[in-house]
């Protein structure tokens, strides 16, 4: 069995490029897999030689290449269709249809303006707006950049929890990034240090699994906010997880919960 790992273009991993690579290395290592960047011109030819492809790719060109590989019988995880469904505006509709709790549009503590057509590539793609004038300015900036697909969500107080999992395997982990001050853009600071409010891990896992199923994205990660009463909302969801912790660190786990040298792709697709 030949296993290939496809890395995201670096612009899709702002401030986490090395951790992204570490995850992919750990995933393909049991099968001595080869890693290639999604923008590499040799990608189409290489994909035709694979049995299984673990892909973090997000560019339209790479996803089209992966579509063709799937058509030829290659198992691709995550499937390109699942990656397309991870656009924020699409996920919002899927979450609402799957009874997955997400933030309301209106609140009392400000707003988040988020680019809806793709994952954040810079700090300017996800903006905290403490008041209405700030929101209006952020919207004007989006329009000046040609961004007309966006989400507006109310800012909610509570603990930020990062989670990651793999459908159909029972593998699900979460942690509090505020415990270590780990952050991609520093946005977690708006929620302060975590209080570790009690909540149902089972319910969080179930909600994430419903969204992953709807998105056809078996290997996933995301963020949630836990309220003092134990309720939660999902504020972010991604194909794969961007793990802001050293692989093998004190919270280290095999990044996608795969046992060394064994894989059952039928359970993931």
Annotate each language-model stretch with its function:
Residues 3-10, 71, 80-160, 198, ...:
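Active-site nucleotide/adenylate-binding loops and adjacent lid/helix of ATP-dependent enzymes
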Residues 142, 151-157, 166-187:
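Catalytic core of tubulin tyrosine ligase-like
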Residues 245-252:
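A short acidic/glycine-rich loop-to-helix N-cap element
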Residues 50-54, 114, 163-165, 230-245:
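A short beta-strand motif that forms the metal-chelation/ATP-contact edge
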Residues 58-60, 117-118, 240:
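Short glycine-rich anion-binding loops that position phosphate/pyrophosphate groups of nucleotides
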Residues 116, 155-156, 164, 223-225, ...:
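Anionic group-transfer/hydrolysis microenvironments
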Residues 183-234, 242, 254-269:
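A long amphipathic alpha-helix within ATP-dependent nucleotide-binding catalytic cores
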Residues 5-104:
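Conserved N-proximal alpha/beta basic substrate-recognition cap immediately N-terminal to
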